[in-house]
C-alpha cells in the first residue's frame, strides 16, 4: 500500500498523480463559492419577502382576502361526492341564477370545466368542434378534447377583436349527411372575454348570431367564460344576457374574481347531470369542497364591483406605456384587464431582458415572445403599483438607450 500512497501523491504506482494540497484547495474554493451563492440566494429571497411584489403575470396570482379566509374557516361542509356539500350547493345555485341557467356544477379548474362541457356535447368519439385558432381551449388546455375525448378541433381564425367571421363559422360546419370522409360537427365554442386577443369582449349581438347558426344546424354552443364577468362589466350587459344563446358556459372563479381555486359550469339540468358523472370520471369529484366554495361566494359578493377599477387601471397602464420611447400599445383595444405591449423594432432590449430587469425591482410580468409582453390587472394591484411599474420600465428602457447612444 505504501508503494501506491504517500502524503502528496495518490495512485503514484498506477502512473496517476495528483497533488493533494492542490486538490484540497480546489475543494475549499468550490465550497466557498457555493456558500457565497447560497448567501446571495438568501439575500435575494429576503428582498423578495420584504419587498412588495407587483405581480402582473395574470389575475390568477391573487391571494385570498381576509374575508375569504374567514369564510373558508367557518364554511359549512359535507361530502360532495356521497351527497351534496351545502356551501357548494349555495355557490352552484347562485351561479345558475346569475347566468340564467337551470343548474351549475363546481369543478377544480377551468380546463376541466371546458373539457367536461365539450365531452357532454360531443358524446360520440370522432365528433368535431369549431373554435377559434387563438382560443384558450385550443392552445392552453393540453389538447384534452382530443387526447381524452377523441374530439376533433376545427379552427377558424380569430379576428383581432376576438370574434370569428360568421360566414367562416358556417362554412366550417360539416354535415353528417355529406361526405363520408369528414367528422361530424356537433359544437361551436366561443371565448368571452378573449384572452389571447387582449381581453376583447364579444357583444350580445355577435353571440346571439352564432347561437342562431348553431341552432340552424342542430349544433350546441359552449362559451368559455373564464372572464365573462369582465366582459359583462366592460359591455354594461348582465352576465345572463351575454350567455343567453349558449347551451353551456364555464366561468372561472380564480381569475378576475380573485377566488383561490375553481370554476363553475352551467347549463340545463340534464347537461349538469351528465357533467357531474364526467367530473367524477376525470377525478374532479371532491369531498368537503365547501371550504373552496366559501371563498368563491365572497368573491362574487365583493370582487365583481372591483372589476371596473381593474379595467381603468389597465387603460391607465396602456396609456403610460405609450409614453415610453421604444414601446407600443394600441390603447383602443384595451377593453378589460389585459394589456399586450410590443417592444418596437430596432430597440436594443428584448422582452426577456426587460422581464429580468423588472424582477430585480419586484415587478413580475409575462413575455409572450421576444418582443411582446402581457400584463394582467387585478384587484390586488393599486394605482401606485401601476405608476411604480411604469417608472421601472421607463428606467430600464432609458438605461439601454443611454448604453447604446440612442
Task: Give residue spans per PLM region.
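Conserved PLP-enzyme active-site core in the AAT-like
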Residues: 2-6, 10-32, 41-361, 366-381, ...
Amino acid at each position: 500500500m505504501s508503494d501506491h500512497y504517500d502524503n502528496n501523491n495518490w495512485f503514484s504506482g498506477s502512473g496517476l498523480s495528483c497533488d493533494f494540497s492542490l486538490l484540497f484547495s480546489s475543494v475549499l474554493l468550490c465550497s466557498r463559492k457555493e456558500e457565497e451563492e447560497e448567501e446571495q440566494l438568501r439575500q435575494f429571497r429576503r428582498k423578495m419577502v420584504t419587498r412588495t411584489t407587483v405581480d402582473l403575470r395574470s389575475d390568477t396570482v391573487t391571494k385570498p382576502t381576509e374575508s375569504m379566509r374567514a369564510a373558508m374557516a367557518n364554511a359549512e361542509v359535507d361530502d360532495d361526492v356521497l351527497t351534496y356539500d351545502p356551501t357548494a350547493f349555495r355557490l352552484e345555485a347562485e351561479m345558475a341564477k346569475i347566468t340564467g341557467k337551470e343548474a351549475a356544477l363546481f369543478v377544480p379548474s377551468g380546463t376541466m370545466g371546458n373539457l367536461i362541457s365539450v365531452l357532454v356535447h360531443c358524446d360520440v368519439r370522432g365528433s368535431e368542434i369549431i373554435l377559434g385558432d387563438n382560443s384558450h381551449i385550443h392552445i392552453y388546455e393540453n389538447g384534452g378534447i382530443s387526447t381524452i375525448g377523441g374530439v376533433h378541433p376545427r379552427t377558424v381564425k380569430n379576428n383581432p377583436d376576438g370574434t370569428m367571421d360568421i360566414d367562416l363559422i358556417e362554412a366550417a360546419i360539416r354535415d353528417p349527411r355529406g361526405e363520408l370522409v369528414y367528422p361530424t360537427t356537433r359544437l361551436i365554442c366561443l371565448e368571452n372575454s378573449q384572452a389571447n386577443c387582449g381581453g376583447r369582449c364579444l357583444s350580445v349581438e355577435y353571440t346571439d348570431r352564432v347561437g342562431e347558426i348553431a341552432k340552424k344546424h342542430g349544433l350546441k354552443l359552449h362559451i368559455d367564460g373564464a372572464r365573462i364577468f369582465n366582459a359583462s362589466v366592460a359591455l354594461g350587459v348582465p352576465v345572463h344576457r351575454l350567455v343567453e344563446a349558449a347551451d353551456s358556459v364555464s366561468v372561472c372563479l380564480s381569475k378576475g374574481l380573485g377566488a383561490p381555486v375553481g370554476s363553475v359550469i352551467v347549463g340545463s339540468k340534464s347537461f349538469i347531470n351528465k357533467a357531474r358523472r364526467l367530473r367524477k370520471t376525470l377525478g374532479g369529484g371532491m369531498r368537503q369542497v365547501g371550504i373552496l366554495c366559501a371563498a368563491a361566494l365572497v368573491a362574487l359578493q365583493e370582487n365583481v364591483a372591483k372589476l371596473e377599477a381593474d379595467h381603468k387601471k389597465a387603460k391607465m397602464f396602456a396609456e403610460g406605456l405609450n409614453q415610453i420611447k421604444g414601446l407600443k400599445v394600441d390603447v383602443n383595444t384595451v377593453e378589460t384587464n389585459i394589456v399586450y405591449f410590443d417592444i418596437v423594432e430596432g430597440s436594443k432590449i428584448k422582452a426577456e431582458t426587460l422581464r429580468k430587469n423588472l424582477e430585480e425591482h419586484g415587478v413580475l410580468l409575462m413575455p409572450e415572445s421576444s418582443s411582446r409582453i402581457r400584463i394582467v390587472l387585478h384587484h390586488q394591484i393599486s394605482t401606485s403599483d401601476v405608476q411604480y411599474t411604469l417608472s421601472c420600465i421607463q428606467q430600464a428602457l432609458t438605461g439601454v438607450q443611454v448604453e447604446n447612444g440612442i
